[in-house]
Amino acid sequence: MTQTAQDLLGQDWDAIIIGTGMGGGTIGRVLAENGFRVLFVEKGPKGHRSERQALHSEVFTPEARQLRGFWPDPVKATVDGRTAEFFAPIGAGVGGSSAFYAATLERPERHDIDVHPSATWPIGYDDLAPHYAAAEEMFHVCGADDPLSPEPQPKLRQAPPLDPSDASLKVEFESSGLHPYRLHSAIRYVEGCHGCLGSKCPKTCKMDGRSAGVEPALATGNAELVTECDVLALEGSADAITGLRVLHMGKTRHISAKRVILAGGALGSARLLLASQSDAWPEGAANSSGLVGRNLMFHLNEMFALWPKRKVAGDGASKAISLRDLYHPRDGSRFGTVQSMGIGAGYGEILHYLRLMLARSALAKLPLVQDLARIPAALAVKMLGNAKVFVGLLEDIGYPENRVVFDPDRPASLNIEYTLHPELRRRRGAFRKAIRRAFKSHRKLFLSMQPELNFGHPCGTARFGSDPATSVLDVNCKAHDLENLWVVDSSFMPSSFGVNPSLTIAANALRVGAHLSKEWRHDAE
C-alpha cells in the first residue's frame, strides 16, 4: 500500500534528514543500509529522472525556478558594504546543489587539516582518509594520480582517454615544468554519457546526492522521501529538538522528531538555525556560542582563457585537467588548485558568465543590463577563438563578521554579509602573479578584474570543534547545545581548502553516519 506524504510525516523515524545533497543523501544511505528508519524532507520537488536542465540564473520567477529544482529566491548579499540580489548556483530539489554540480571530487592537502595557520580541526587528515576512500568508492570517482602528492594515491577508477586537444595541452604543460593530472570526477561514463557538467544527469552516471545517496537509501526499504516540504523552524526545549514546523502542500504543520540531521547547505542550514528563535533559544537553535552563521567562507574564482600552442581537433571543452603546482607555495601562501572549467570560450558560455557578473555588480538594477552583455560576449568570442577556460580556486579564510544573517521580515531568504579582507586581496594578487608565471609559455587572458566569490562553495557557518565557546558542533558534528541535532553539510568546515568541498562533505557524512550507526545500535541494546 502506497503511503501518502501526510502518512510519512506523521510516523516515528530514527532520524529525519533535512536536505538531500552531498551530506544529507550520503548519511541517509549509510543509516538506511545499517537498518535505521530514515525520512528525507526536501524543500524542492522530486523532479523527473529524465531531466537534464542546467542551473540557469536567467529563470527569474520563483515558481519556475522551484519547478526546475533551483533555489527559488535570489540571495541578498552585502559585499564590502554594497548590496546586490542575484540567483546563486544553489539547488532545491532531490540531490540539492549536487544535482547540478560538475562532479569534481578531490581530496584536500594534509596541511589543510593538520597544520592550518588560521583554523583548528578537531580531527586529523588520517581520521578522514579512510572515509575519503569510501566516498571515492561510493561516488565511483575516476581520475589519475597527482604527481606532486606525498600521500598514498587513492584507488580511483580509470577515466576515459583524454580528448586529443586536452592530451596535447597536457603535454604542453608538462614540457613547461608543470604537473597536470586527470581531474578526479564522479562520473561513470556510461554509454551515451554527456558529462552533465552544471546540469542534471538523466542516467545513474553522474554520481551526486541523489544517485549515490537518496536513491540507494530508498532502495533499502528503510528510507522514505517527502518533497516540497519546507522546514520553517526547529522546535524543542533548551537541550533537545522535539519537532519541526514545516510548510507542505500550502499548509503549516508540526511533526515530531526523535533525531534531526541538518544538511541544507552552509547558507540554508545557518538560516534555519537562526530562524528557530524561541524562548528556549533566543538567538536561534544551537547558538549559545553566537557563532551560527559566522565564519562564512567561499572560494575566489580566478578565471582565465588559455590558448594551446597547437590547434588539435577534438570533441571540444572538457573538465579533465587539474594542477596543484600552485596549491601551497614555498613561501607559505595559501592558494589552491587550477582546473579546466569544462566550458569553451563560446558565445553562450561567455554570455552566461558576463550576466552572472553583472547581476552581482552595481549595474544590476539598470534596465536591460542583461541584454547589454551580448555585445562584449560577441566581441570576446572573436578575440578568444580556440581558447580553453581555466579557473584557479583561491582558499578563503573564515572571519566572524562574514556571516549568514536572518531577516525576520523575509524569513525564507538567504542573506549574507561579507567583507574581502586585505589579506585575501593580497593573496589574490599573488595568486594571479603565480598563474602568470606558471603559464608564461602560453598566451592567456584573465576574464575578471574584480574579485569573484564562488557562491556555489559556501562553508564554515556552523564549524565543529572541541570547545563549545568557539564552535557550534562537536567532533561528531552534534550540536554542543542539543542532544539530538547533527549538521553534516559544508557548515561544519573550519577551513575552506583550495579544492571543491564536495568530497569532504561526503567523507564527513560517512564518518558521522558510521559513528551514529554504532552509537544508536548500542543504545538500542
Identify the meaning behind each predicted range.
Residues 33, 40, 44-54, 229, ...:
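Glycine-rich loop(s) and the adjacent beta-strand/alpha-helix scaffold that form part
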Residues 66, 77-78, 117-231, 463:
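Conserved redox-cofactor binding core of oxidoreductases
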Residues 494-516:
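A conserved FAD-binding loop/helix module that cradles the flavin
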Residues 123-134, 426, 430-434, 511:
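A non-catalytic, amphipathic alpha-helix used as a structural packing/dimerization or gating element
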Residues 50, 143-153, 446-451, 522-525:
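Short, glycine/acidic-rich hinge or "gate" loops at secondary-structure transitions
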Residues 75-88, 97, 101, 121, ...:
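FAD cofactor-binding and catalytic pocket of flavoenzymes
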Residues 2-126, 268, 285-308, 317-320, ...:
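N-terminal glycine-rich phosphate/pyrophosphate-binding loop and immediately adjacent elements
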Residues 183-199, 232-237, 386-394, 412-496:
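A glycine-rich dinucleotide-binding beta-alpha-beta segment and adjacent secondary-structure elements
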